[in-house]
C-alpha cells in the first residue's frame, strides 16, 4: 500500500515522513501549475484535500515538519520570464471551510481568541470568492506605478504594463486617496466575454480556451501587453497591502473607499453578525451563482473591525480573521458514449468513460475515470446511459451515478476485457489480497513485452526522482518510442540516442518539433546522467513496491550495484540466504522481496538491466558504519538543533548505523536534546533514557 492511501492515524513515523515528502512535492507541483503556468490539473477540492492531509500529518508528527512544508508556503515562485517583485506586505492565502459546521467552528474560534461571550455578535463581511488571478497594484500620489501577481505570496511577477491595459484598473485614482496605496483584488473574465473570445478564436482557425479563469490568468501574464489589451479582462478590488494612511478602520469601510477611488467592488458583499447570517448569505449567493455571469468558487468571511484583525493575527500562511467557505463541486448530466481501457506502468488496467462533451463550471468535460471493474458494477452504469458527472477541475472528473428514467432500451453493459488492449493481447490477471482472495486491480501479464507498460516504465525512468533527464518528458518518450529512426524501447536505448543519430541520414534536428539546439541539449542532458547514484538506479528500474525510500534503503544496505544485482538474481533463483540478507534490512518485507524476485526472474528484464548497466556508471552508496558508537541504537532528536538541520541529523545518524525515531519509547537508546525540548525530554526522564545535548552528540560520534 502506498503511503497516500494510509489513514493519518495509522501511519508509522517513517511512513509519515515519506508521505510529507510526497505531499510537499505534489502540492508544490500543483501550486506551480496553478499560480505560474495557469494550467491546473486537479480540482480545488482535490487540492484542498492534499493540504488538509499534509496539515493533519504535521499535527500528528510535529517533529517531521519540513523546511519546505506547504503549510508554510503560499502559491508558487515567480517564473523567470517576468521581473520579480517582492511584496512589501505578503499576499497571504486563506484557510478553507467546506461545511456549515466549519463556519460555525471558525466563528467560535474567533470569539474564543478575542475572549468574547460564546454568542456575542461579531461583525463580519461576506463576499463572493472570485475565481481569477490575484493581483496587487501600487499607487503613489494617485498614479499607478507597479502591479504584481501573487507568486508565492512573498515574491510575484511584474505585470505593470499588462495591468495598465485592463479597463477596470484606473491609471489615476479619483477622490481623496492616500499618498501610498496598494490595491489588491482579482483579475477575471465574464462568461459572455469568454464565449465571445472563443468564437473569435474558432472563426480565425485558432485553438479555443478551456475556461475563463485560466484564460484571464494567461492573458494577464503575456510578454506582449497588446495581447492583454485585446482580451476583455475585468478586476474586482477587495483588499489592500501597504497604505500610508488608512481611510477607514473597518473591512467594509476600506472596500467602500476603494470604490470611491475608481475601482469596481462586488455588490454582493454584506455585513453579518452571526454564523447563521453568514451561512444564509452563503446559500443565497450559491443560489445565484449560475446567473452571476462570472466564476466564483465560494464565499469569503472576514472580521470587519481592523483592530480585531490585528489582535487575531496570523497562523503560518493564513490570517485567523478570515476564511474561504468553498462551494461543493459542480455537477451535470451527459451521455456515456463508451468505456476505454488504459494501461499503467505496473500493468494496471483502468477503465475511462468517454462522454458526450458537457460544460461543468466552465470546463468542457469529455472523459471520466471509472477506477476498476468493481466501480462500474457499483455505479450500475451502461454505455448509452445518461450519467451525472462531478467536476474535478480540468482533468478527468468523477461519475456519480446514472438517471434510471433516462436509460435507453439499447444501453450496453460493459464487459471488462480478459486480455490487454495492446497488440500482444496478453492475458489479464487479478491481484491477490492479503487474505489470498482476488483484488480489484486487474493487470496485463505481459510485463515489459507490453508496449503500454514499456512507455510508462520509460517515463518513470526519466522522471525527476529517477534519472531526471532534462528535456526528456512524457511527450518526448512517446515520440521516441514510436519513432522509426531513433526508437527507444528500453532505458539503455536512451544512452545510445546520440550515437545512433550520428549514423542516421535523417537527423533528430531535422524532425518536426526539434532543432539543432534542442537536439544538442537533449544529448548533453543524457550524457550528464551516465553517472548515477545507486538508489536512483534501483528506483529507475520500476520494480513494483520499490519506491524512492525503499530504493535508498536497498542502496545503503548493499552499497554497490554489483552487490544488489547479484543478490537480486540469487533471490530470483531461490537462494534463501540471499533472501534472509535482504529481509534483515530495515523496512524491507516480503512484498518488496517478492517483487524483486519476480522482476529478476524474468529473462527479458535481466537483459534490459544488463544493457542499461553497460551504459552507465553507478556510484556506490555510503553504507552505514557497523562499528560506530551509535550503530544499532535507536535515537531521538528533539528541540532546536543549532549545528545541523533535523534532516542532516537523521542522515548522519543513519550513516553511522543508528535508527532514528520520532518519538520516545522504551526502545529508545539515546535522546539528543536541543533548546526548547519539551515532552520528549520529560518522557526520556521517566523511562530513564540517556539524554545528551548537541555538542555531546558530536563528541560521541567523533565529529
Curated annotation (Swiss-Prot):
Positions of the BRCT domain = 625-703
List residues binding Zn(2+).
Answer: 420, 422, 444, 450
Cofactor requirement? Mg(2+); Mn(2+)
List the active-site residues. 129 (n6-amp-lysine intermediate)
Catalytic activity, reaction form: NAD(+) + (deoxyribonucleotide)n-3'-hydroxyl + 5'-phospho-(deoxyribonucleotide)m = (deoxyribonucleotide)n+m + AMP + beta-nicotinamide D-nucleotide
For this UniProt entry, what's an example GO CC term? Answer: cytosol
Question: Record keywords: Nucleotide-binding included?
Answer: no
Instruction: Note the CDD domains from the entry.
Output: BRCT_DNA_ligase_like, LIGANc
Q: What class of enzyme is it?
A: ligase
- Note whether Metal-binding occurs among the keywords: yes
Q: Of which family is this protein a member?
A: Belongs to the NAD-dependent DNA ligase family. LigA subfamily.
Purpose? DNA ligase that catalyzes the formation of phosphodiester linkages between 5'-phosphoryl and 3'-hydroxyl groups in double-stranded DNA using NAD as a coenzyme and as the energy source for the reaction. It is essential for DNA replication and repair of damaged DNA.
**Protein name, entry field:** DNA ligase
